[in-house]
Amino acid sequence: MKAMILFGHGARDSRWREPFDRLVQLWQAQHPNTPVELAFLEMMQPSLEEAVSSLSLKGVTQITVVPVFFGQGGHLRNDFPVLLEACQQQHPNITLSATPAVGEDLAVLQAIVDFGARAL
């Protein structure tokens, strides 16, 4: 079974998480047969390892991690690969892969341009 993890930075203010929760709700409404979990780099739970473990308990065998970051900064270039590899070592029966940061996708950038245009 395939699944997705939406991976964010995390923040001290719990309200920062609200858009991520909405993303999960949208995903579940549109893809009810594909599990999705949130995971955060720091300051929020669950961690990437906790999310992978949760999906593992549900019988998931393939996980795509989607970094919900605007670009490939130090966390995604340096910290994220180490975390992903540690998860792979702890869960050798799961195939883990990752997409680029969502902000590098042209459709995401266009959605931001469209959002700005609607605000004018």
State the predicted function of each range.
Residues 1-120:
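Active-site-proximal alpha-helix that buttresses catalytic centers in soluble enzyme cores
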